[in-house]
From Swiss-Prot:
Source organism of the structure: Janthinobacterium sp. (strain Marseille)
Pfam families associated with the record: DUF494
Family statement: Belongs to the Smg family.
InterPro entries in the cross-refs: Smg
HAMAP family: Smg
Protein name: Protein Smg homolog
Domain of life: Bacteria
Length: 158
């Protein structure tokens, strides 16, 4: 699923630039992605859009400035793990994501079905949340999101 998500990010500037679902499935299949992987990724993206709409409607005036402290439930800690929680806190304290985006990231990480989720996959989730909202991470955060693999070719920022 995560390979499909990264491919979509690298290929399409914004989610609305993607072809319709049927054409996208055909294109992804032709490239070599498995049907199950494609279905999971597209389902995950649909749920991301629904979660974003729900939270945006519920908290329309939420800003990037919050002085509250997020307490994680045991289930969330089990799925996220300490490195992921630390990374989310770093992003929020640096004002790179706001509290609503944080909640979307957490919800989508829980929906990924992995426990604990790797930091690399959490970074893809963060990138996809920003991408789905039409927000481009600045160069420094983009480097932070993809700094791990020294042998990989450089990723392109839109």
């Amino acid at each position: 699923m995560f390979d499909v998500l990264v491919y979509l990010y690298e290929t399409y500037y914004r989610p609305d630039a993607c072809p319709d679902s049927e054409a996208l499935v055909k294109k992804l299949s032709a490239i070599g992605f498995e049907e199950e992987e494609i279905a999971k990724a597209l389902g995950w993206l649909t749920a991301l859009a629904e979660t974003t709409n729900e939270l945006s409607d519920s908290y329309p005036h939420q800003t990037a400035f919050s002085f509250g402290i997020r307490i994680y439930a045991t289930q969330e800690m089990d799925v996220l793990g300490t490195p992921a929680v630390g990374f989310i806190q770093f992003l929020e304290s640096a004002k790179l994501i706001n509290p609503v985006q944080r909640e979307i990231v957490i919800e989508r990480a829980l929906a990924a079905g992995e426990s604990p989720i790797s930091l690399e996959k959490l970074k893809v989730i963060v990138l996809m949340v920003l991408w789905s909202q039409g927000k481009e991470p600045d160069g420094l955060i983009f480097d932070e999101l993809f700094v791990d693999d020294e042998d990989a070719p450089p990723r392109m920022l839109h």
